[in-house]
Regions:
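Conserved beta-strand scaffold positions in the cores of enzyme catalytic domains, especially
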Residues: 75, 150-152, 181, 185
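Glycine-rich cofactor phosphate-binding loops and adjacent beta1-alpha1 units
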Residues: 22-25, 64-149, 214-215
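A local structural motif
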Residues: 51-52, 94, 175-180
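Mid-domain Rossmann-like dinucleotide-binding core that forms the NAD(H)/NADP(H) cofactor-binding site
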Residues: 1-84
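Structural detector of well-ordered beta-strand residues that form the stable sheet scaffold
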Residues: 31, 55, 122-124, 151, ...
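Residues in the short beta-alpha loop(s) of Rossmann-like NAD(P)-binding domains
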Residues: 60, 129, 156
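C-terminal hydrophobic helical "lid"/dimerization subdomain
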Residues: 81, 111-115, 157-215
Length: 215
């Protein structure tokens, strides 16, 4: 049940951000910005889609270590730190796809993410922004001249009736590692601890387990 619980939202959102909204193709270079639960699912989506280099970017060292275990080829603490290495590894082309799965998106960061997006590449915004914020900073000349794309994504562009059964089938076949994304399980009376661990970056995914005593 704990594996199925993750497939209600986080797994299809992340996986679909790479495979549907991002349409990652074999041989492409991909950056995943934020490798928590949704980002790790996006990372696995990029791996399964056949990405060549996968750059995991997250300020939490433990999450970067986990990302390498899930298939990332490189890991960095920030986009600024990653940019020079991405340019060197891709011979200046940068990333065909940039999947942004941070907890909260801010307009001031969009141009930074677009900066590691390749010519004619796509930056997918899966992380949510503030509904009251309308201050995206973007170099429009570079957007036009380099034909870059900025793509919003909800639920990874997934079809729940089709994709959730498919994801569970991939898990059963050993192609999608969902179980190892569950860092810790909590009782209902530990729910506040679970939220705090999430905010502190201690979990890839935490699961609240209900028992008969909770009814």
């Amino acid at each position: 049940f704990e594996v199925a619980a993750l497939c209600g939202c986080g797994i299809p959102t992340g996986y679909g951000s790479s495979t549907r909204s991002g349409d990652v193709r074999p041989g492409e270079d991909v950056a995943i910005v934020g490798v928590g639960g949704v980002g790790t699912a996006a990372l696995q989506g990029a791996v399964i889609a056949g990405a060549r280099n996968i750059f995991a970017i997250d300020p939490v060292e433990w999450k970067r270590e986990q990302a390498l275990k899930f298939g990332a080829t490189h890991a960095f603490a920030s986009v600024e730190e990653a940019a020079m290495s991405i340019a060197e590894i891709t011979h200046g082309h940068m990333c065909h796809k940039v999947i942004v799965t941070v907890g909260e998106v801010h307009g001031k960061d969009v141009d930074t993410w677009m900066g590691i997006t390749a010519k004619a590449g796509t930056c997918v915004l899966t992380g949510m922004g503030n509904m009251m914020e309308s201050d995206v900073t973007l170099n429009l000349a570079m957007l036009t001249l380099l034909q870059k794309n900025l793509q919003g994504s909800i639920f990874g562009g997934a079809n729940p009736k089709l994709d959730i059964p498919n994801l569970l089938s991939m898990y059963k076949l050993g192609k999608l590692n969902i179980a190892d994304m569950i860092t810790r399980q909590y009782r209902l009376d530990q729910i506040n601890e679970g939220y705090q661990d999430m905010l502190d970056g201690k979990n890839i995914r935490g699961v609240i387990r209900y028992t008969d005593e909770d009814h």
